[in-house]
Amino acid sequence: MAKISKRINKIHEGVDRNKLYDLSAAIGLVKERAVAKFDETVEIAMNLGVDPRHADQMVRGVVNLPNGTGRTVRVAVFARGDKAEEAKKAGADIVGAEELFEIVNGGKIEFDRCIATPDMMPLVGRLGKVLGPRGMMPNPKVGTVTTDVAAAVAASKGGAVEFRVEKAGIIHAGIGKVSFDNAKLEENIKAFADAVIKAKPSAAKGEYVKRVSISSTMGVGVKVDPSTVKVVD
């Protein structure tokens, strides 16, 4: 118990919960307080001035992080014939059509990202109740419904991150690992923030980006001055 208390104290030590840190300082604090015995993910949370209950205020998109995410992404592709072969050659972990549908429909999800060719969507659409809640339903808006399956697989493996605002108006995403250089984390964070800003719906009024914070998997959240992540309304 004493060890746990000591670890918690170390995580919170030196972090002012009411202060807005510039991005560089915030990254340093997060890395210094990552004391878990594994390479923790660095996560960002952005509170947005939108009400996602209204369809015209939904914020979603995809961004290719310049330095990747640091994690191994397992990719499934729904495709037939030549497109299935293209997906396999590009490094997709699972490729199939009706047989893959049966596996997924049975609740066996052994992938992190799902891609489909347009002709497969009548079949894949029937998996909405399985893939939808997990945020894995292929969507042309984020490049996961496409005829260029090779490029989609490469992007998914290379650092493509999907984002979608939650009910409370918050967007969460993993943008790297604690082992990354500070500069690489900063580049990833700025790329992610820029993508979220560009996805601002026209129906959003007033302040768009209200708060930004970063943390590690097991660490404390550090508030970031939005202006230092190039957040401008």
UniProtKB/Swiss-Prot annotation:
Q: What protein am I looking at?
A: Large ribosomal subunit protein uL1
Q: Which UniProt keywords apply?
A: Repressor, Ribonucleoprotein, Ribosomal protein, RNA-binding, rRNA-binding, Translation regulation, tRNA-binding
Supply one GO molecular-function term. Answer: structural constituent of ribosome
Gene this protein is translated from: rplA
Subunit structure comment from the entry: Part of the 50S ribosomal subunit.
Which residues pair up as cystines? none
* GO CC entries: cytosolic large ribosomal subunit
Q: What does this protein do?
A: Binds directly to 23S rRNA. The L1 stalk is quite mobile in the ribosome, and is involved in E site tRNA release. Protein L1 is also a translational repressor protein, it controls the translation of the L11 operon by binding to its mRNA.
What InterPro entries does the entry give? Ribosom_uL1_bac-type, Ribosomal_uL1, Ribosomal_uL1-like, Ribosomal_uL1/biogenesis, Ribosomal_uL1_3-a/b-sand, Ribosomal_uL1_CS
Record-stated family: Belongs to the universal ribosomal protein uL1 family.
Pfam family membership, one:
Ribosomal_L1
Q: Which GO terms describe its biological process?
A: regulation of translation; translation
Q: Which CDD domains match?
A: Ribosomal_L1
Check the record and name the PROSITE patterns matching this protein. Answer: RIBOSOMAL_L1
